[in-house]
From Swiss-Prot:
Functional description taken from the UniProt entry: PsaA and PsaB bind P700, the primary electron donor of photosystem I (PSI), as well as the electron acceptors A0, A1 and FX. PSI is a plastocyanin-ferredoxin oxidoreductase, converting photonic excitation into a charge separation, which transfers an electron from the donor P700 chlorophyll pair to the spectroscopically characterized acceptors A0, A1, FX, FA and FB in turn. Oxidized P700 is reduced on the lumenal side of the thylakoid membrane by plastocyanin.
Binding site for chlorophyll a B3: 662, 670
Keywords carried by this UniProt record: 4Fe-4S, Chlorophyll, Chloroplast, Chromophore, Electron transport, Iron, Iron-sulfur, Magnesium, Membrane, Metal-binding, Oxidoreductase, Photosynthesis, Photosystem I, Plastid, Thylakoid, Transmembrane, Transmembrane helix, Transport
Magnesium as UniProt keyword: yes
Source organism (scientific name): Panax ginseng (Korean ginseng)
Listed name of the protein: Photosystem I P700 chlorophyll a apoprotein A2
EC number of this enzyme: 1.97.1.12
Transmembrane segments: 46-69, 135-158, 175-199, 273-291, 330-353, 369-395, 417-439, 517-535, 575-596, 643-665, 707-727
Reactions that this protein is recorded to catalyse: reduced [plastocyanin] + hnu + oxidized [2Fe-2S]-[ferredoxin] = oxidized [plastocyanin] + reduced [2Fe-2S]-[ferredoxin]
Length: 734
């Protein structure tokens, strides 16, 4: 009996119902709530698990390299990146029959294969990999790193190698290590790789371990570095006629500021990127030497924060007390990390398509669409997680005495003002945007499209013009040829940048009009509403006017009985749960907008987006319905084609999504009654009644059923859109 799951909670292990299993799974990672947990063991467990996480990441990336080297067509893709379709891996058992085998045999392969839409081919090509042997070498190296990570994780669980709590709470050393050791050194190492391997490869020179000590990355070697003539490294860059991967039109520069894109690959100049990483490395190496550790010099974080008291007195005691609050709360630290990472991930999505870093990826439209959508969804989940852990911080870790009258306390003191302002902004955006869309819908329906309300986004156009886009005729800042900003950059990066901004073959500063104005405000509605729900959930996590003692009920209580006017749907968990639906909704609008605008751009019929995006029926008919037609034809009475797998996934995604509602729109009593009936029938059925179970079956709790419903809703939603996105894009552009 002592060994029953969960081992970390004796109370749960002795529960006679199936609740034991579900609650066990739900709290498996909530180390703080486990029996016998100490602060020291908590930190040590989390630290050791990080190595396991790294091991999984290295193993996964190793697998990518290995499968492409084994079953892909990297070497033939390298010969013609624009016309050969990159293969991810083989398909052992294509469904169904000979037509499937024929449909999936492509990309020059001998048998059925999956096409890669992840951009790894372009990435590996850009950083200097050229052969399958290179890929195998990389796979083995990452496998080695994975093994090292596992050993390190195991090692740090051994008594002799377990770090102490004081080591984990040494904020200055950790900052220095992460800034200099991780960001600084890795950026410097990456600059080294770009200069020594990637840039020579882009010029047709193959540098590997056997010759990298003999090949000078720059004709003058380290001379210019030591003599202070750093500008020599920027002289003689690749010409605009340079053929990537060959010496034709190649230069000798290694660190440049050309601006814009390489004309052939439509990606950023490699020498610009090397320069960028060197600058980042320098900044972070300096930043990592700013905090006081063993030598008694530099900043103390506590002193810095305690000194941050705005003199006007309008923020009370400012940042006093924050050092200990943050340093002693893992949830606060995780919340900050997730908020930062979420924003960065969304920025990655925005920059990967507008400023492509990898050669030829801009012309691989399906990959562009897949990467944008992937990173925006990931960002959404990470950002909602930030608020969830912020709420848990307020419930478990926040001390009013430690934070008296500082910025945290003042946030809680005027939470009504924050929440009501967000609510007002959301209502304003929602009613006005929907009002405009619906008005336009009605005008179209009654055959008077000229009566639509179409608003030009003049402020956004002005901002684009300030960055050098000339088509709007604003003549301001970088789009004004006689301004100081224009003249200052004329000799370095500006010509390349202006050329890129004003050329219509890329995604940098797309021309915008009334359709963009409307969908921008629809997205703003989604962002503000999601934020409203999350912020309210976190700020009310300790208590609200209705339920001042909410803190005592924890993070995820369902209700507090019928008293107080009914307290269902007000726990911090409920806010997170509702916010995820809004987050998915918002990212749906974001990705619909991005995808439709780009499909029309790539097909050369931008007027379709411009004309149809100003009313809801246009979105439903000319984006969703029109682009799902090929998808629905993956299987038809005449057979099947290579889109069949996406057609199946589209259907399956809808099924999973719809299953979510079974958990979301029904209450416990129904399930409990059903379970009792099934258990009764089971116990009275010959043969079946030979199988017994220890735990009495009980229905999921309200919170658990909601989680299961939310998981199905999210997974189904994403599967459905992923299939639609990839099939509709690859069906058009291959």
């Amino acid at each position: 009996m002592a060994l029953r799951f969960p081992r970390f909670s004796q109370g749960l292990a002795q529960d006679p119902t199936t609740r034991r299993i579900w609650f066990g799974i739900a709290t498996a990672h909530d180390f703080e709530s486990h029996d016998d947990i100490t602060e020291e063991r908590l930190y040590q467990n989390i630290f050791a698990s990080h190595f396991g996480q790294l091991a999984i990441i290295f193993l996964w990336t190793s697998g990518n390299l290995f499968h492409v080297a084994w079953q892909g067509n990297f070497e033939s893709w390298v010969q013609d990146p624009l016309h050969v379709r990159p293969i991810a891996h083989a398909i052992w058992d294509p469904h169904f029959g000979q037509p499937a085998v024929e449909a999936f045999t492509r990309g020059g392969a001998l048998g059925p294969v999956n096409i890669a839409y992840s951009g790894v081919y372009q990435w590996w090509y850009t950083i200097g990999l050229r052969t399958n042997e290179d890929l195998y070498t990389g796979a083995l190296f990452l496998l080695f790193l994975s093994t090292i990570s596992l050993i390190a994780g195991w090692l740090h669980l051994q008594p002799k190698w377990k770090p102490s709590v004081s080591w984990f709470k040494n904020a200055e050393s950790r900052l220095n290590h992460h800034l200099s050791g991780l960001f600084g050194v890795s950026s410097l190492a990456w600059t080294g790789h770009l200069v020594h391997v990637a840039i020579p490869a882009s010029r047709g020179e193959y540098v590997r371990w056997n010759n990298f000590l003999d090949v000078l990355p720059h004709p003058q070697g380290l001379g210019p570095l030591f003599t202070g003539q750093w500008n020599l490294y920027a002289q003689n860059p690749d010409s605009s006629s340079h053929l990537f991967g060959t010496s034709q039109g190649a230069g000798t520069a290694i660190l440049t500021l050309l601006g814009g894109f390489h004309p052939q690959t439509q990606s950023l100049w490699l020498t610009d990127m090397a320069h960028h990483h060197l600058a980042i490395a320098f900044i972070f190496l300096v930043a990592g030497h700013m905090y006081r550790t063993n030598f008694g010099i530099g900043h103390s974080m506590k002193d810095l924060l305690d000194a941050h008291i705005p003199p006007g007195g309008r923020l009370g005691r400012g940042h006093k007390g924050l050092y200990d609050t943050i340093n002693n709360s893992l949830h606060f630290q995780l919340g900050l990390a997730l908020a930062s990472l979420g924003v960065i991930t969304s920025l990655v999505a925005q920059h990967m398509y507008s400023l492509p870093a990898y050669a030829f990826i801009a012309q691989d439209f399906t990959t562009q669409a897949a990467l944008y959508t992937h990173h925006q969804y990931i960002a959404g989940f990470i950002m909602t997680g930030a608020f969830a852990h912020g709420a848990i911080f307020f419930i478990r870790d926040y001390s009013p005495e430690q934070n008296e009258d500082n910025v945290l306390a003042r946030m809680l003191d005027h939470k009504e003002a924050i929440i009501s302002h967000l609510s007002w902004a959301s209502l304003f955006l929602g009613f006005h945007t929907l009002g405009l869309y619906v008005h336009n819908d009605v005008m179209l329906a009654f055959g008077t499209p000229e009566k639509q309300i179409l608003i030009e986004p003049i402020f956004a156009q002005w901002i684009q013009s300030a960055h050098g886009k000339t088509s709007y005729g604003f003549d301001v800042l970088l789009s004004s040829t006689n301004g100081p900003a224009f003249n200052a950059g004329r000799s370095i990066w500006l010509p390349g940048w202006l050329n890129a901004v004003n050329e219509n073959s890329n995604s940098l500063f797309l021309t915008i009009g009334p359709g963009d104005f409307l969908v921008h405000h629809a997205i703003a509605l989604g962002l503000h509403t999601t934020t409203l729900i999350l912020v309210k959930g976190a700020l009310d996590a300790r208590g609200s006017k209705l339920m001042p003692d909410k803190k005592d009920f924890g993070y995820s209580f369902p209700c507090d009985g019928p008293g107080r006017g009914g307290t269902c749907d007000i726990s911090a968990w409920d806010a997170f749960y509702l916010a995820v639906f809004w987050m998915l909704n918002t990212i749906g609008w974001v990705t619909f907008y991005w995808h439709w605008k780009h499909i029309t751009l790539w097909q050369g019929n931008v007027s379709q987006f411009n004309e149809s995006s100003t009313y809801l029926m246009g979105w439903l008919r000319d984006y969703l319905w029109l682009n799902s037609s090929q998808l629905i034809n993956g299987y038809n009475p005449f057979g099947m084609n290579s889109l069949s797998v996406w057609a199946w996934m589209f259907l399956f995604g809808h099924l999973v999504w719809a299953t979510g509602f079974m958990f979301l729109i029904s209450w416990r009593g129904y399930w409990q009654e059903l379970i009792e009936t099934l258990a009764w029938a089971h116990e009275r059925t010959p043969l079946a009644n030979l199988i017994r179970w220890r735990d009495k079956p009980v229905a999921l709790s309200i919170v658990q059923a909601r989680l299961v419903g939310l998981a199905h809703f999210s997974v189904g939603y994403i599967f459905t859109y992923a299939a639609f996105l990839i099939a509709s894009t690859s069906g058009k552009f291959g």
